[in-house]
Swiss-Prot record:
Family matches, as PROSITE patterns: INTEIN_N_TER
Lineage, highest ranks first: Eukaryota, Metazoa, Ecdysozoa, Arthropoda, Hexapoda
Compartments it resides in: Nucleus; Cytoplasm
One Pfam family from the record: HH_signal
EC number, as in UniProt: 3.1.-.-
Protein name: Protein hedgehog
Species whose genome carries this gene: Drosophila virilis
Gene name of the encoded protein: hh
Length: 483
């Protein structure tokens, strides 16, 4: 929005306020006439008519009306509307200059022997480690839950109902997948050929023994559908999916008690660095509110943006991270639920993808020596456990960390929705920056206090981010969340 547009809107807002208050003044005058005693009616009517005419004619009184409490209220409301119009939501266009437009997302089927993510099933970035076999007399048997979803066919060859038993997380993902199958192929239902196994018919380290794995197919046994079935399983939220055989798909999930699930938000490591506008690199643990760091705008171009708050900051917490290694040598370390910018060359568009769903041969945006963000191939995906989490939020909603472009958001798959969800915090930061007293106080503090003291004051999850995380389970569909 340019300055001329802002000036035009502001002029219209001022004129509207004056008109509304003049009308209110006229209505109040007429009300007083109706309430006056009979003996004074005629004289008061004449006087009030003269006053009304004066209001319409005298610009000094018009200016006075604009400063009445009601006029100030209207002016404040219109100012807020003007600010809202000035907000820009996040787009996903091509990186650099003019490299395409965002299109609808298409789902691509998996190929035979492909796994998502491309990690060992037992790594923390996938379904996680084995916890132990569950028998009917095991204390953990009570943690298994039956699945009576009528949209799912359970083969149950044993006749004991064992195939209906599974972990809570597995049941949740399986139910989500069943809806996707019916939407994709009307009249076809999801077929579960194996779930919890008590007869030890699988390998020694199978997650079937814990109720954390299912073997699935479609009810029509059409093998041409299985590649897309595997993709739908990935979209449903299974933590590890394998197109293991032409006859079926294998899926598994993390343990219900995994601490990896409890940490729902997304962060970077404290040792990761951001590039300041001055050209210096700064560890995220030392980053402060007000620092201008390298980010990405809605056109996929490199820009500098202010840090307005920290979504989370805890330098002592142990956490599992995903590491994305690129062919340029850049390595990004981030929590699995964090959104990463992934370039889709076949569609010439950018997608925001959860870090644990980025695969080898995908392209991410890397800040290179030319000063621009360019696509580079991911050559390896690994996992690591480290201490400390830091999640800065910039005004753009993106940040370049260790030379790799990433979102500031996590947990939900929509970058635009997450960016709008934080609009109140951006507005609050803007209003605070306009306050002279606040600016003078900040200037005085800068002379006597290290700049990173702002960041040092916070330890833990920001109250607003925490509120959004709690609300998301009630207002967002499961397919939009990283669960």
């Amino acid at each position: 929005m340019d300055n001329q547009t802002v000036a035009a809107i502001w002029s219209c807002a001022s004129a509207t306020c004056l008109s509304l208050d003049a009308k209110r003044h006229s209505v109040e005058t007429n009300t007083n006439d109706r309430q006056a005693p009979p003996g004074l009616s005629n004289s008061n009517n004449n006087n009030n008519n003269n006053k009304s005419t004066a209001v319409d004619a005298d610009p000094r009184k018009l200016r006075h009306i604009a400063h009445t409490p009601r006029g100030s209220c209207f002016m404040a409301l219109l100012l807020l509307l003007l600010l809202a119009l000035n907000f820009r939501h996040a787009h996903s266009c091509g990186p650099g200059r003019g490299l395409g437009r965002r299109r609808e997302r298409n789902l691509y089927p998996l190929v035979l022997k492909q796994t998502v993510p491309n990690l060992s099933e037992y790594m923390s970035g996938a379904s996680g480690p084995i916890e132990g076999v569950i028998q009917r007399d095991s204390p953990n048997f009570k943690d298994l839950v039956p699945n009576y979803n009528r949209d799912i066919i359970f083969r149950d060859e044993e006749g004991t109902g064992a195939d209906r038993l599974m972990s809570k997380r597995c049941r949740e993902k399986l139910n989500t997948l069943s809806y996707s199958v019916m939407n994709e192929w009307p009249g076809v239902r999801l077929l579960v050929t194996e779930s919890w196994d008590e007869d030890h018919q699988h390998g020694q380290e199978s997650l079937h023994y814990e109720g954390r794995a299912v073997t699935i197919a479609t009810s029509d046994r059409d093998q041409s559908k299985y590649g897309m079935l595997a993709r739908l399983a990935v979209e449903a939220g299974f933590d590890w999916v394998s197109y293991v055989s032409r006859r079926h798909i294998y899926c598994s999930v993390k343990s219900d008690s995994s601490p990896f699930i409890s940490h729902v938000h997304g962060c970077f490591t404290p040792e990761s660095t951001a590039l300041l506008e001055s050209g210096a690199k700064k560890p995220l643990s030392e980053l402060a509110i007000g620092d201008r760091v390298l980010s990405m705008n809605g056109k996929g171009q490199a820009v500098y943006s202010e840090v307005i708050l920290f979504m989370d900051r805890n330098l002592e917490q142990m956490q599992n991270f995903v590491q994305l290694h690129t062919d340029s040598g850049a390595v990004l370390t981030v929590t699995p639920a964090h959104l990463i910018t992934v370039w889709q060359p076949e569609r010439e568009a950018l997608d925001f993808v959860f870090a644990d769903r980025v695969e080898e041969l995908n392209y991410v945006l890397v800040h290179d020596a030319t000063g621009e963000l360019r696509p580079h191939r991911v050559i390896r995906v690994s996992s690591v456990r480290s201490r400390g989490v830091v999640a800065p939020l910039t005004r753009e909603g993106t940040i370049v960390v260790d030379s790799v472009a990433a979102s500031c958001y996590a947990v939900i798959s929509s970058q635009s929705l997450a960016h709008w969800g934080l609009a109140p915090m951006r507005l609050l930061y803007t209003l605070q920056s306009w306050m002279p007293a606040k600016g003078q106080l900040r200037t005085a503090q800068d002379k006597s206090t290290p700049k990173d003291a702002t960041a040092q004051q916070q330890n833990g999850l920001h109250w607003y981010a925490n509120a959004l995380y709690k609300v998301k389970d009630y207002v967002l569909p499961q397919s939009w969340r990283h669960d």
